[in-house]
Amino acid sequence: MASSRRGLLLLLMLLTAHPGPSEAQHWSHGWYPGGKRALSSAQDPQNALRPPAGSPAQATYGLPSDALAHLEDSMPWEGRTMAWWSLRRKRYLAQTLLTAAREPRPVPPSSNKV
């Protein structure tokens, strides 16, 4: 009876005690945000050949090849599409409001008919 209680208590402690989220990145996420790997990068960045010390390439070795890419190139196509459509909606709304403000408002029919 005591061993079953001890086992149940141990099981309960194991189920409730959680070490927290892992700081490691899952292999499917890649090295860069969005889960993409640069095509020019080696499969294992630790074993990549480094340029000689003192060369200009040594200073930029730690940067990914697309670190200075334009926003459109670095954004996934889903994000680009969503940003484009929200921009078009905002532009359409602003245009509609501006043209509605310029047009004269129709005079409502009077209810004082004799």
UniProtKB/Swiss-Prot annotation:
Pfam families named in the record: GnRH
A GO cellular component entry from the record: extracellular space
Region (Disordered), start-end ranges: 35-59
Signal sequence range: 1-24
Compartment(s): Secreted
Modified residues (Glycine amide): 34
Gene Ontology MF terms in the entry: gonadotropin hormone-releasing hormone activity; gonadotropin-releasing hormone receptor binding
Primary location group: secreted
Alphabetic keyword roster: Amidation, Cleavage on pair of basic residues, Hormone, Secreted, Signal
PROSITE patterns listed in its UniProt record: GNRH (PS00473)
Role, per record: Stimulates the secretion of gonadotropins; it stimulates the secretion of both luteinizing and follicle-stimulating hormones.
Homology family: Belongs to the GnRH family.
Protein's recorded name: Progonadoliberin-2
Native species: Macaca mulatta (Rhesus macaque)
